[in-house]
Amino acid sequence: KLTDKVEFSQDSISFLQYGDAHIGMRAGEELTLEDSLYAVLLASANEVSYAVAESVGKQMGGDYNTFIEAMNEESDALGCTGSHWTNANGLHDEQHYTTAHDMALIGAAVYQKEAFRTIAQSLTHQIPPTNLVNEVRTVNQKHKMLWPQNANYYEYCKGGKTGYTDQARTTLVTMADNGELQLVAVVLYDFGSDAYTDTRAIFDYGFNNFSKVMLKDLEKADGVRSYKDEENAYVVLPPNVKFSDLKAEVKAKDGSVNEGTVTYTYEGQIVGKADVTLDNKKSVEKPTITKGTEKTGTTTDRKEKESRPVVLIAVVAVVLVLVTGAVAWIKYKQAKSRRHRRKRHRRKTSQKKKKP
């Protein structure tokens, strides 16, 4: 539960290095999991990421490394194919890596969690005094697309995660919802504010060129009797693509003869997926490929592993912190760059004044 306590061990504090983003937690302090996730997602607090991983790992019957294993297992289950996690903060490690595709899958999954949406959209949050520190800690949103007064503000933005390391450069994962489509944009190895410009361009293209088609308005694929949640079952069609161009794959869930999934693809890319009740008159024990007729189905599985929601929220939230460990470094670099530009401007101004 989000009210569970996260205790900070000495390990969670002592691993910090100079320049690592943190909120000044002490060994022996306790926060709720909810406040911890605010610190992770808004302030990129590295010691909190470690403590969350360690605490949830203990709840799973293990330790910090148990949580790291869970991160890898969860990303594999989501369909990630180019990721491997070795820590819970995103600081550079040759064996800690991901892809834009995988981050989009993770972003789409975590966006289904109400707790994540609430935290990720918050502009500021106050962490109350703890058992050891009698002061309020305030954490502020780093994602500029959420601040109305910022030049990078984007009205459809629903949250995300900023990141930076010297090796990965600027990275940004962003969720957006225009009332019809929900999209995730991922930019990696970008440069400063260009990440926001590039993210906006991705969203503009997505919202202007893709359309959502509801499954309930179309003919069901062979082997499908009904949809578990037809109000949220749909496919997203690329430009100039008809539903009849899609392929449908119907599979029975492990150990079930009545429940399954239908997955629609276009040229190998998944464009929709939905939980279904199977038509037992049709054989679907093995995957059956059928040509789409007039229908589409999609929704991220919103009921995934409800028996361990805290683990999923914590895993994906920390995964979204992939490259946020050195926030202090980017501030330093930006400040240094501004000083350099001011000096260069003064030199140019001085040279102009010296001209006859």
Predicted stretch roles:
Residues 80-81, 95-97, 101-102, 107-316, ...:
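Domain-terminus/edge residues, biased toward the C-terminal soluble/receptor-binding domains
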